[in-house]
Amino acid sequence: MYLATTTGTSDTDRIAGMVKNAIYGIIAAKADGIENPTVGIANIDGARQTEKALLKLKEQGYDINFAESARADGGIVMRGNDLLAGTPDIMVMDSLTGNLMMKIFSAYTTGGSYESLGFGYGPGIGDGYDRLIMIVSRASGAPVIAGAMEFATNLGSIPCVSSLRCLIRDSR
């Protein structure tokens, strides 16, 4: 599962950031070989507004394949059990929640002493980015660094993302 989050660089507005994170997550998953990735939104502050914006993008023709929560009531907004079960291919989060989840999932096997699972914090995708940016941290262990290098190789070069500002603005 891809955790679609940033370090706060996608946008200073939580909702706009989460919408962009969804788009960037779709780009990363497709570039990594998933042809039609499913998207879920973590049940956090801003989830319903993000859902509304993404549904509007879909209505306007942007190709988004939404996941269905495993819970009996279903829906696009995912709960904790969906996160643990890997229900969507892409889980959309804000920067704070996403950073927390990245750290928990990557370091839980070591008791938090270093990150032993995952593929790093990349790629950096955004409006006007013309190169692939992959990120690891000083807490990243050798397995995460190796995973990040493998992920970067799989992604090759992500096509330039054009005019996301208009896409986000028009979805509101």
Feature locations, PLM:
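Glycine-rich phosphate/nucleotide-binding loop
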Residues: 1, 78-79, 84-171
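Short, acidic/small-residue loops that bind anionic groups at enzyme active sites
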Residues: 1-8, 13, 63-72, 113-125
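Glycine-rich beta-alpha junction loops
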Residues: 8-10, 43-48, 70-74, 94-98, ...
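Glycine-rich phosphate/diphosphate-binding loop of Rossmann-like nucleotide-binding domains
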Residues: 11-70
